[in-house]
């Protein structure tokens, strides 16, 4: 339980901020999800794909592996750049665009995969779905004023300051 509460604090909070910032940068997407609330689950997946809250995760190779002509030896440290995978043009068309109708948005790797997949991924998605539902019920628009201040981290992608105006 503690892992769910503490482990997802920064990441879910930063995904919430990214939801606001992304819909500010792509106001047509706010309009789409506002007109069709059934898009909320895909909106959440797309926000998490567009700006994954963690840039990477490091692992240690348990055995020698040959990959794309390179050898990763047992014991080597490997960084999996979620940011890069989620913006891979071979997997996502127009990957730098936030598209709440993206058909393969759930194919992101922001939660990792396999035995190391994020334990709280469904909780995070639920929290973000509730956030979107409540924002759309209460506000006609949320506008970001000025440029948000990003946190200084190569690991966590988020914001330390974001001024907004909330429109009824």
Residues covered by each model-derived region:
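Cytochrome P450
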Residues: 1-168
